[in-house]
Amino acid sequence: MAEATERLYRVEYAKSGRASCKKCSESIPKDSLRMAIMVQSPMFDGKVPHWYHFSCFWKVGHSIRQPDTEVDGFSELRWDDQQKVKKTAEAGGVAGKGQHGGGGKAEKTLGDFAAEYAKSNRSTCKGCMEKIEKGQMRLSKKMLDPEKPQLGMIDRWYHPTCFVKNRDELGFRPEYSASQLKGFSLLSAEDKEALKKQLPAVKSEGKRKCDEVDGIDEVAKKKSKKGKDKESSKLEKALKAQNELVWNIKDELKKACSTNDLKELLIFNQQQVPSGESAILDRVADGMAFGALLPCKECSGQLVFKSDAYYCTGDVTAWTKCMVKTQNPSRKEWVTPKEFREISYLKKLKIKKQDRLFPPESSAPAPPAPPVSITSAPTAVNSSAPADKPLSNMKILTLGKLSQNKDEAKAMIEKLGGKLTGSANKASLCISTKKEVEKMSKKMEEVKAANVRVVCEDFLQDVSASAKSLQELLSAHSLSSWGAEVKVEPGEVVVPKGKSAAPSKKSKGAVKEEGVNKSEKRMKLTLKGGAAVDPDSGLEHSAHVLEKGGKVFSATLGLVDIVKGTNSYYKLQLLESDKESRYWIFRSWGRVGTVIGSNKLEQMPSKEDAVEHFMKLYEEKTGNAWHSKNFTKYPKKFYPLEIDYGQDEEAVKKLAVKPGTKSKLPKPVQELVGMIFDVESMKKALVEYEIDLQKMPLGKLSRRQIQAAYSILSEVQQAVSQGSSESQILDLSNRFYTLIPHDFGMKKPPLLNNTDSVQAKVEMLDNLLDIEVAYSLLRGGSDDSSKDPIDVNYEKLKTDIKVVDRDSEEAEVIRKYVKNTHATTHNAYDLEVIDIFKIEREGESQRYKPFRQLHNRRLLWHGSRTTNFAGILSQGLRIAPPEAPVTGYMFGKGIYFADMVSKSANYCHTSQGDPIGLILLGEVALGNMYELKHASHISKLPKGKHSVKGLGKTAPDPSASITLDGVEVPLGTGIPSGVNDTCLLYNEYIVYDIAQVNLKYLLKLKFNFKTSLW
């Protein structure tokens, strides 16, 4: 359904007497006015209300400026209660004595702002992150503690100057003054005067005087204002009358009709029956007062009144809710069935047909509430940190011998806002040396186990001086292959106000996300039979997943709703004891990539009962029978993910171990194979793409699922280019994220609504396909324990790999090609050739044979991530699958090459912490080239053309090219090509037939990043 703006607060009449107040712990009587703050549930992917008695709500310091826009359910209250909420909010929640001036009215004390002298030196200013000394004046804003919302609103302290700087963000309005602060009267006379000057009430006199100067008729203005006030008063009276009419109908219906009667009335008038007595009563009263609602024109769903409009509760597709919202829905006359006319109230009820009125939209609507949560958030980018304190709320561990001593390092870290820690488990970041990482001491093993990123010492210097983002600096100085995320300790949750409320693109919700360390631990699944037993069941060592009739009773389900902001999972397993006839149903649920969620283990009386219960739960969650061959997606129901928990996981572990002494392969080849099949690198690549390793661990990627995701991206590309509706874009985005689980923490999954996002996801799927190939190779094939794991993996590549002698002529030619064709604009690194391998893929030479006679054959570069090379060597360079959208590639789906080494090297995706990359040299049969200067989505080459050449402004000097065995090697230095009206800096070569490529060499390169990247 269309979702109303998410609001931080809620108000209603208690539906029962079961809820207890979060402040006084007393029960809240049924039908009494109660208020709540909405917080993220720790048990499931959604928000829950924390209820208070009306009076208790204000006592804990909740502050509301505009109840009509900030409080959900406000307009559904009785008129008198609406006024009660408004008046209490206007009084700042807590009415204070105030200060009297010149016989004027007493000022209202603001309940959520306070001033006092610090009672100790333990508090920290939330503006500058410096300590507030004991006895120093401090100001506070009450906010919800993200870790302990049950405590209600607590003080977040600031130095007075820091408070003044953040006045707008903290919601201290222009009309407020220092004298309205709680505790102001207890300050010294001197501090009162100083504070009054710092926090004056800003009056809007200037504009009036300016208007007079401009000759604006003040009399006319006053008349206009009077007219507006009269109009406003008239609307208010009408709203009051409307409210009283609706509540009169509700009161009379409660006396005269049973809940079943009300349901019958809704059914007779072709309205959906909601759950809950109060919701049923609301719908009937709305229909009687304004007419029966006609179905939504977009999806034929039911429209429902919610505060500021009628929202559709239907679904556009099985994946996406309808977005229709209107204040003028189509209606028909409400009809009372004959049998109900015996009820005296319904018999005499006559209501004049009218439209529902809505209060005018506020000129300064409340901003959407920030995510309020039970726990804190580790974030990849410390966006909330002050510019001069980039390491705010971060704990840093130092390891090994640094150029600075420990005290100097500590001083520098604290100056940047961080804190020193001695524990790997508590650390956000580790500062060490490359030597220490290679040594892999016991302490470094702890750092790796905790998945804490390691950076070099230069990071501290650059983070204080560079304008680059923290994330870029972390990547540039990284020394470890692990550590996908940098944790930041929780800061405050600020409810932004005014223009400054626009959320930062890099901001993340204040919820503790499940770090990769946690994910890694949960990935240690115990495999028995056909699937992995979830360790959260506590039965991984004593039970296995039941397999019956060739079907494994284990399911992982996903559900994404971008509008609502949910990114949910549901896991279901039927477990059978290893030793006796005992059975359990285990299920777990929550939000992907976070600790939010829970689980349940139920012991079943028998195998039959367990199977029946499993199938019932599966059908309840998906709408499909367990044994159904063709799955149908239903609205609001989960979708099954093809997670392949194969029995060959142990084989992967065996083959992924470090090589022994059995291998007969040359040492450089051994190292190359180890690099290509490095499982940690594969995991890191997935994490970079925000793939959720817990829901979709390595090796669980189904090729069919990836291809289905490509198809969705093709539809997205089409929808974007055709300017399709928001509903269609939403639908496709929901489907994509359900199919490929992403870890967004508490952020809403982003809409796939532009070509850039499509391109990024296409690149992600390209890499996933290659990782899937690599992992499939690791799992399959020989299990010969007499062979070294490296040799076993080498055989799976089906490629003859020979080390080229460093002193040979061909090695000299290749090194010259590397040196001469490094582009001047690619100056962040230099390339050093470590090893050169001559490669011959099985069957490729035979496949290439027909093209050996084609003219214009060149030796060209092709770079790719290390994780893609198992797929490249075992299957060759491939063209994107037909399901992939064309827009992901500049010149359509083909195999891309370059004549400038650094152009291809950029696709190796190396970093300062991971500087080794692999690059290919392939003989490419280009023939007649179709020359282009701008992007063109080629699906078929023009007649007589064999390839595409994207013309660049710079190209290797053609006079320096050499020819080896009829193949041109363009190893000249880069010179202007004479082509200026092109969008490319350097040449690109694309072939659309895989047989036109014969891979010749593989180079292992070291990227020597320059110390200053800016």
UniProtKB/Swiss-Prot annotation:
Covalent link (Glycyl lysine isopeptide (Lys-Gly) (interchain with G-Cter in SUMO1)) residue numbers: 203, 487, 748
Cytoplasm is among the record's keywords: yes
Post-translational modification N6-acetyllysine, affected residues: 97, 105, 131, 600, 621
Major localisation: nucleus
Modified residues (N6-(ADP-ribosyl)lysine): 521
Annotated active site: 988
Catalytic activity: NAD(+) + (ADP-D-ribosyl)n-acceptor = nicotinamide + (ADP-D-ribosyl)n+1-acceptor + H(+); L-seryl-[protein] + NAD(+) = O-(ADP-D-ribosyl)-L-seryl-[protein] + nicotinamide + H(+); L-aspartyl-[protein] + NAD(+) = 4-O-(ADP-D-ribosyl)-L-aspartyl-[protein] + nicotinamide; L-glutamyl-[protein] + NAD(+) = 5-O-(ADP-D-ribosyl)-L-glutamyl-[protein] + nicotinamide
Reported modifications of this chain: Poly-ADP-ribosylated on serine, glutamate and aspartate residues by autocatalysis. Auto-ADP-ribosylation on serine takes place following interaction with HPF1. Auto poly-ADP-ribosylation on serine residues promotes its dissociation from chromatin. Poly-ADP-ribosylated by PARP2; poly-ADP-ribosylation mediates the recruitment of CHD1L to DNA damage sites. Mono-ADP-ribosylated at Lys-521 by SIRT6 in response to oxidative stress, promoting recruitment to double-strand breaks (DSBs) sites.
Sites of PolyADP-ribosyl glutamic acid modification: 408, 414, 436, 438, 445-446, 457, 485, 489, 492, 513-514, 520
Region annotation (Zinc ribbon) ranges: 291-333
PARP catalytic domain mapped to chain residues: 788-1014
Cell location: Chromosome; Nucleus; Nucleus, Nucleolus; Cytoplasm, Cytosol
Residue numbers binding Zn(2+) 1: 21, 24, 53, 56
Every PADR1 zinc-binding domain range: 225-360
Crosslinked residue numbers (Glycyl lysine isopeptide (Lys-Gly) (interchain with G-Cter in SUMO2)): 192, 203, 250, 468, 487, 512, 528, 748
Binding-site residues for Zn(2+) 3, renumbered to this chain: 296, 299, 312, 322
Top-level division of the source organism's lineage: Eukaryota
Site keyed Cleavage: positions: 214-215
PARP alpha-helical domain: residues covered: 662-779
Family of the protein in this entry: Belongs to the ARTD/PARP family.
Protein name: Poly [ADP-ribose] polymerase 1
Species the sequence originates in: Rattus norvegicus (Rat)
Name of encoding gene: Parp1
